[in-house]
Amino acid sequence: MFTEEEFEEFWKGWSEQEEANYKVVKDKSGKDSKKYLKKGYTHFDLRFWFPERKVELKTLLKNGLRFYNKNHQTEEWWPFNPFLKILLKTPRYKYQQSEGHYDLETKIRPICFASHIDGLIFGFYAYALTQKYEAYIAKEGFSECPLAYRSNLESKCNIQFSKEVFDEIKRRGNCSAIALDIKGYFDHIDHNILKEKWIKVIGEKLPPDQFKLYKALTEYSYVSKNSILRKYNVNLKKLAHSPSTLLDLVPGKMDYEKYQRLRVDRLIVTNNKFKVLKKKSTNPIDTTPRKFGIPQGSGMSALLSNIYLIDFDKDINERAKNEDFFYRRYCDDILIVCNSDKAETIQKEIIAKIKDEYYLEIQDKKVELTEFRPNSKGIIRAFNMKKQVNAGLTRTDAKNETLYYKPLQYLGFEFNGHNIYIRSSSLSRYFRKMKGRIIKTVVMAYSNNGKDNKIWKNQIFERYSHLGNRNFLTYAYNASKEFYKNSKNEAKEGMNSPSIRKQLSRHFTILVNTLSSKNNQRFLYKEYKGKAKKRKKV
């Protein structure tokens, strides 16, 4: 537990942040209506209206997650609910280098949502322990290295992080960039190592409440909503009312009966991953079973992913200073900028270190070695060294060098040694989503519910054009500027990139033309079916 002074300080800072997510507004009848500004989801408990119940939550937290159970008439530990697990699917077109063409791949990412009150508990501890983490890495001298999930970076974002890397490459001129991606990072975090680093950050043995958190996040359980629907033959479309909680979908009268039913039917799954992980170099005969994996998506998981690698960050940062290379880590993405003659050695040693000491693997297909060197015209360009080595070439010339051009991709941007661009896949995804939204809007306009004689395009403009606030386009335009104002009205440095501005220059023309085209197509179809006589106005 925290000292009383620490707790009050942490509670004040976190509760002010949290309360901003709740708002009371007037409904159409003029009555007060509660509005949650955070995205909602159905879980085992009802949504928690923080402004009214914050004293209840504060008492639980101040007591170190101990509460009085009226039914049992005893003081007990807080019982964390199972997480709700979903599979987030993202379609992406990826270039298959060996086959020489693009293929559609679907990236599947498991995300775990905590119950509403559990999420607030995780949120408070994440806020409090982040203060401890920030103090620790500042004291140890590597606070500039980890970039993701930070609270003490002066409102910097990926624009500034990427610019720093690209500026470092420009400063060095001839150099190489090594980009590494940790495979399934959250799913492979070793529990013993995590506990060891957690203790190091707070400077003491885990207090009982934090040990309870540690157990909740390493021995976590989860359910799948789809599994519940299939098991109990529930068709959401045929229900008279939307379920208030997941328990409404489970047969039984009392909540404890429903939880028991879920356990008996094996719909509550517990994380019990363990395996014998052998180190290749330091101790090849170590056959100790290692337990691993934490839920990705909980309020604590992001912070723990940084805590896990505190010694890795410190070691690589010290080596970077001694050997004159540049190191940054954004969660599971590692980036090194170094002299080209040292690149291969540094790459191999970092891959070995993270495997031997942290039981993590680097995805081979995502290892990128990009060399920045003058082309035949003396202009610094980015070369794909993996492709060049596979082709058996030690050098390129004016005839073949363009075959090996490949920009460095980092945090949504591309740098070819001369110009900075928005990552091409990000731009493609933006246009794909824009067209999808246009089609959906036009179809709705011509449906039986579309009573107006026009297409409501305000939402499209808000989400997919420069006219909106805080969308992809405004972010990209901010990146293209020399300076811009962020959401807090603070002046921030952009990339001053004419190339990005050129990439975005036709977006509004494409949007308007697509809207007009889809409107015409839908009208002709409806007219042919005898269901429309007049084209909708755009």
Model-based region annotation:
Residues 1-101, 504-507, 511-538:
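Non-catalytic, polymerase-adjacent accessory regions of viral genome-replication enzymes
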Residues 83, 87-123, 141-153, 233-251, ...:
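Short, conserved non-catalytic motifs in the polymerase core
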Residues 115, 119, 123-125, 259-292, ...:
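Right-hand nucleic-acid polymerase module
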Residues 131-142, 177, 205-210:
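Short secondary-structure capping/junction motifs at helix and strand boundaries
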Residues 172-331, 335-349, 402-405, 447:
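Conserved polymerase palm-domain catalytic core
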Residues 338-364, 384-388:
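Helical (often loop-to-helix) elements that flank the catalytic cores of nucleotide-handling enzymes
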